[in-house]
Amino acid sequence: MDLSPATIYSRHRPSPCELRPWLLAHGAPEAEPGAYQQVLARLGRRHEANHLAGLGPVADLSGGTFAERIGRTRELIALGERALYQPVFQSTIRIDGADVRVVGIPDFLIRDGAAYRVRDCKLALHADEGRHPEILRQLELYGWLFERTAGAPPTALEVVLGNSTIVEVPFDGGDRALAALHEIRRTTALDAPPYSPVGWTKCLGCGFRGRCWAEAEGRGDVALVYGVD
């Protein structure tokens, strides 16, 4: 199983859940996105496209095989390309004696002096520990992958919020993001799924809601009691 910023996102969204990454890693069937999720996806693509349109000439790396995109990313960074769209990074980390591949595809790399700014578009209006810690971890992981690829840290990690405000995320060398990946990897490596209580608000928008609620009802889970969430 590859790890990526999306792995961290799955742990936090649509709500924090220890079970969701395990289900994804083990190929559990997931419901198709509902109308609301589809609208969010369209808005996200439009937000990204609008920012892309305002950047001027950009090397578009969104096409090609995964291996080709990785190689092209390295090549263009070495050449000092002014801006890259959908670059691909890959590295490995060691978790419990095993090498695990880590991949990441930030939206943009923007040339800044001798290095680059890593920039990603989000619909969220905030990016902080209290409201969207997963955004911080994702950007930190992109920064770590960039440093492993380019041999130097990014000059900045930036989020383009849903209102087009650009917010900078402090770079800690990737420590917190890697710690999050270690935790998730150890959970997904379990033979049996971890327990995570269902909740009306917690499970809204999750593709595994039907599965988890059916199992909770089957075992008479206390989390089904009214007022327990």
What residue spans do the PLM features occupy?
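Mg2+/Mn2+-dependent nuclease catalytic core
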Residues: 79-182
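A residue-level signal for conserved active-site and pocket-lining positions in enzyme catalytic cores
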Residues: 17, 108, 142, 206, ...
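Cysteine-cluster motifs in flexible loop/terminal segments that predominantly coordinate metals
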Residues: 10-23, 192-221
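Metal-dependent nuclease catalytic cores that hydrolyze phosphodiester bonds in DNA/RNA
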Residues: 1-115
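Short, intrinsically disordered, charge-biased short linear motifs at domain edges
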Residues: 1-5, 186-197
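Helix-hairpin-helix
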Residues: 222-229
